[in-house]
């Protein structure tokens, strides 16, 4: 099945990269059902199996894909580029991928024709995003609200994407245990998926309008951090009493979703690690 091929392709490519070869030739024979019926699925699987650390290892991987046209291979490559972006962001250490750094990565999409605007802490406060700001206030790294728009001429539909953007989540005063905190550099995976989707859509020239919203911040412990028992006012005008500071994603997303609704969203895809 296609899923079976997907499960096999990744590990085989991953194991290959640790064998120390200067170059590798990989001949791909049809082994899975392609998405398009012409080999695109096969090509995409092999492309996604490419090691993330290839830029550090200097290994050359040559793919031999019989029966796959250049056009289909190029389409698969463009999809994979979006996945690579999301993967790289999720794996960045939190001392490097701060909210501001995530915003800078989003701004790079302007080169592909994506409209990107980044709001600082003052602008966020002026909007009235009290829940988002409460989560962010415990960190020395200021929050950023990221707005994206991909609107090709003749777009046939609109989809709004909202991604959770916690670049690190300690749990706040409802502190996580160490073993649970170890993966919290990836609590911005929803935001990474949004940015990856915009990159892939722009590269593919998809005939759909996309709008994206990311509330990027950190949830840390400090003398300024929000507390259990605090009452917060959200962008929608509703108030929330905090009973657990480790439920921060619901607060940041509440403001981001309310903003999407204010911008006229009718179909929203929300992406988060909760």
Placement of each model-derived feature along the sequence:
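Hydrophobic alpha-helical scaffolding
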Residues: 92-96, 184-188, 243-250
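N-terminal hydrophobic/helix-forming segments and targeting peptides
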Residues: 1-167, 264-266, 271-274
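Alpha-helical metal-binding/catalytic segments enriched in His/Glu/Asp
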Residues: 106, 159-161, 175-218, 249
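Active-site glycine- and acidic-residue-rich loops that bind
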Residues: 126, 140, 191, 248-253
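A glycine- and small/hydrophobic-rich beta-loop-beta segment
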Residues: 206-274
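Glycine/charged-rich beta-loop-alpha catalytic/anionic-binding loops adjacent to active sites
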Residues: 84-89, 157-161, 167, 172-184, ...
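Predominant activation on well-ordered alpha-helical scaffold segments within soluble catalytic domains
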Residues: 87, 103, 107, 145-146, ...
